[in-house]
């Protein structure tokens, strides 16, 4: 809804002075000339882009132009239930853990706790959302698109990606580590409820989970830690960063005032308040460090460590990403639900994406 209304407003005669811009909307808005280049104005209003995390700033850059300032972000990480690990005498995972470590922990946590013959506590959960399984593909050395973002063949159907798809889908189809959630549309809520009720040991998530988890911890219902996504042995750690920022319409008549507002919204008490509420990490590097240092639970420090190995989603670069994402979601459904071999399914989807990206380039 917001996306549609934003595009309509930007094309109208009375656009907003400033607008929120998620990473997936950057190609659609910026590459079509809908956002003002802030670079010529930042010096005039006393803003130094170097204050912001440069990986995040790059999302809004096109050549020498800068078409937005990042407000906040999250890497995708793994949350773990400390109580379940303690009961099983399992050490808490560390940032250098591997897929083998993850499987070992998840298997030890998958149990029939009441002796009725049915599993009622699971090691992890299979989340069908691309936003959460993409970093697992990266951490296995694979990818869904090739480096230029213009084709999938040779990458989505590569050996590393196929093995990562098979491994991730296997949580649900063969390893028995994940509960069966019959309605995929309810998966995010069902997974969160299982974790909150102490029946799930490991959960793939982002900073958006912190407000609710913080409340559960404060009430004494949970003890939670966060750790980086594990990587396949021999592969460098990796995760995805989801970023949002503020931009100015290209046709705004109040350019200087609008740029000042963008700077204030991204580097101010308001941004710190969002971070302290657990909604995201602030994009200003010093502010993110300050939030982590003040967090007595150590959660934000874990997110910052994970972010050091992160990179923005393909959505920040590929204009047709939503169509690409739909086909990738179908790919995972074919692997998990209809049990199509991952190699075959990936090959078919790679060719579909090549045609899609060629048509929309």
Task: Label each region the model flagged.
Residues 1-5, 24, 97-104, 180-196:
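Short helix-initiation/N-cap motifs at beta->coil->alpha
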Residues 88, 170-178, 215-281, 337, ...:
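Extracytoplasmic/periplasmic substrate-recognition and gating elements
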Residues 227, 276-330, 334:
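Long, aromatic- and glycine/proline-rich binding clefts that accommodate carbohydrate-like moieties
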Residues 23-75, 227, 295-296:
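Hinge/lid segment of periplasmic solute-binding proteins
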